[in-house]
Regions:
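Bacterial Sec-dependent signal peptides at the C-terminal "C-region" and cleavage site
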Residues: 3, 7-19
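Long, low-hydrophobicity ectodomains and other hydrophilic envelope-associated domains
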Residues: 17-209
Length: 209
């Protein structure tokens, strides 16, 4: 059944609002929040290449796997610190990104079953033609600077809305890939495992041990 564009937009908005909110569970040592899977190959010229794994609405969703529901990036930044994650520094002047190492998992319902996979499983490494190897992600913490939206200094992720990056050349995501690549086309969506567009998922972040 086809819906008018306006109704389809309302249905999409309702689905976004139903996503899990940000939860900081200090006892369990977890930060969780809801997201949804994104449409792949929005721009064919990119040939499936992505630069991010998690974006907020208004971020570069056409180069990402997951988009969050309503989320305050600053609260996420502070929430990660509450579970013991210490922010470091984005890559700069030839030095790679630094910061606490994180383990990030994606959970979703597949029929009657609940599935859970490391977030890197959703990335295809074009150099090996295999899923990205398991890594511990870096809590770099985002570069600071002027944010037009609030007319003040702050974390630039608030403006870019790209939470988790695959290349260290973008210093604005809170979380980045430990592989010190600055830019490129190495990473693509692993379509073999990514659930269909719009599937609700839960992002689970823990300090790596």
């Amino acid at each position: 059944m086809a819906f008018p564009a306006s109704l389809a937009a309302l249905l999409l908005m309702a689905a976004t609002q139903d996503l899990d909110p940000l939860v900081v569970d200090e006892k369990a040592g977890q930060v969780t929040f809801g997201a949804k899977t994104l449409k792949t190959d929005v721009h064919p010229q990119l040939k499936g290449a992505i630069e991010y794994l998690i974006t907020m609405r208004g971020g570069k969703s056409y180069e990402s796997c997951f988009e969050t529901g309503p989320l305050d990036a600053l609260k996420l930044y502070l929430g990660l610190q509450k579970i013991g994650a210490v922010p470091g520094k984005p890559a700069a002047e030839g030095k790679p990104a630094e910061g606490c190492k994180l383990r990030i998992t994606v959970e979703w319902k597949d029929g009657d079953k609940v599935r859970k996979e490391p977030i890197e499983s959703f990335v295809l490494d074009d150099t090996t033609q295999k899923p990205m190897e398991k890594v511990q992600w870096i809590f770099a913490g985002s570069k600071g600077g002027y944010i037009p939206e609030i007319d003040a200094e702050g974390l630039l992720v608030i403006s870019t809305k790209n939470l988790m990056g695959l290349y260290q050349g973008d210093p604005t995501p809170l979380i980045t890939n430990p592989t010190p690549l600055m830019t490129g086309n190495r990473y693509k969506v692993n379509k073999a495992i990514l659930p269909k567009e719009g599937t609700p998922v839960k992002i689970i972040i823990e300090v790596a041990k």
